[in-house]
């Protein structure tokens, strides 16, 4: 249903629709020529599983991010340990205890990756999909051939869709700038996070982007081209990848992204989408 609606939207605008199959049943959606384009504007369209805790990301504070991941992993161990303890009390078979432990691990992994879909996903990643579609609708006709818009599948399962895309278009992606929007809807601090390769090889381009990001009112759009900045999403699969995301700010954690993967993911600010759309249009236009 989703792919059909997106196809109708794109074809009404004059784009050619295509699908590419990838690993584990991934189906990436494309508008434009993936071999000739200079830019890929991307977002993932798959829906994450509903979890009892958010995916808490602190891009500029790796210590807090890793600590949170460790705590979550330990919480996952609790039901496994309880199940193993009960099995040990109810049976004297070491094999039964071992199978119980492995069974619980497999079940928890399945729930994490393939469990009931989170019906509230305004930020992750309805916001990114809207951005891609908005840019398609507003990009001047003369710039369209420079851009291939791609909606990746199976990002939540481990960047599967984008990895499949990269494998299929190995030569083209070496030179293409990949602008990947993920979770841009909730927060006043919007970051463009370029890859290490892009920082090293094209610092002048990043400096020009900073002028495009200036003057955004109460919201800020920043090119984060110095220091550690971690945001796990599809841009990580590309040498010239740029992650684009929105964050809130606190004195305790610095910039952070929360609520996603839970029923509380209900915020997607239109202004965020508009700001990012205009910045990306400027980036594409500067090379015209």
How would you name each of these model-derived features?
Residues 187-288:
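Active-site-adjacent substrate-binding region
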Residues 2-12, 24-27, 84-89, 93-203, ...:
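Acidic/histidine-rich catalytic neighborhood of metal-dependent amide-processing enzymes
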Residues 1-36, 50-88:
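A non-catalytic alpha/beta surface segment that caps or lines the substrate-entry region
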Residues 26, 36, 174-176, 239, ...:
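Sequence-level motif detector for i,i+2 pairs with an aromatic at +2
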Residues 59-66, 120-124, 268-272:
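Short alpha-helix boundary/capping segments
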Residues 46-49, 157:
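Short acidic, S/G/P-rich loop/turn micro-motifs used as interaction or catalytic elements
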Residues 44-47, 100-103, 183-184, 246-252:
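Short glycine-enriched loops at secondary-structure junctions
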Residues 38-43:
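Short beta-strand element of the alpha/beta-hydrolase
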């Amino acid at each position: 249903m989703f792919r059909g609606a997106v196809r109708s939207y794109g074809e009404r605008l004059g784009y050619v629709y295509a699908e590419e199959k990838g690993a584990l049943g991934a189906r990436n959606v494309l508008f434009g020529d993936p071999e000739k384009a200079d830019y890929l504007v991307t977002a993932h369209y798959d829906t994450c599983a509903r979890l009892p805790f958010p995916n808490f990301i602190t891009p500029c504070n790796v210590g807090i991010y890793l600590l949170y991941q460790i705590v979550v992993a330990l919480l996952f161990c609790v039901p496994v340990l309880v199940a193993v303890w009960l099995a040990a009390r109810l049976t004297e078979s070491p094999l039964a205890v071992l199978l119980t432990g492995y069974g619980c691990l497999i079940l928890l992994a399945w729930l994490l990756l393939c469990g009931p879909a989170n019906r509230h996903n305004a930020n992750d990643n309805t916001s990114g999909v809207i951005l891609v579609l908005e840019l398609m609708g507003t990009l001047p006709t003369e710039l369209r051939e420079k851009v291939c818009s791609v909606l990746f599948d199976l990002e939540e399962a481990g960047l599967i869709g984008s990895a499949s895309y990269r494998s299929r278009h190995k030569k083209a992606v070496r030179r293409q700038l990949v602008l990947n929007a993920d979770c841009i809807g909730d927060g006043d601090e919007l970051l463009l996070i370029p890859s290490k390769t892009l920082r090293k090889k094209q610092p002048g381009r990043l400096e020009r982007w900073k002028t495009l990001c200036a003057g955004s009112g109460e919201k800020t759009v920043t090119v984060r081209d110095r220091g550690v900045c971690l945001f796990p999403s599809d841009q990580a699969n590309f040498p010239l990848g740029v992650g684009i995301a929105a964050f809130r700010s606190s004195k305790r954690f610095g910039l952070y992204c929360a609520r996603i993967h839970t029923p509380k993911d209900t915020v997607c600010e239109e202004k965020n989408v508009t700001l990012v759309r205009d910045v990306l249009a400027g980036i594409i236009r500067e090379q015209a």
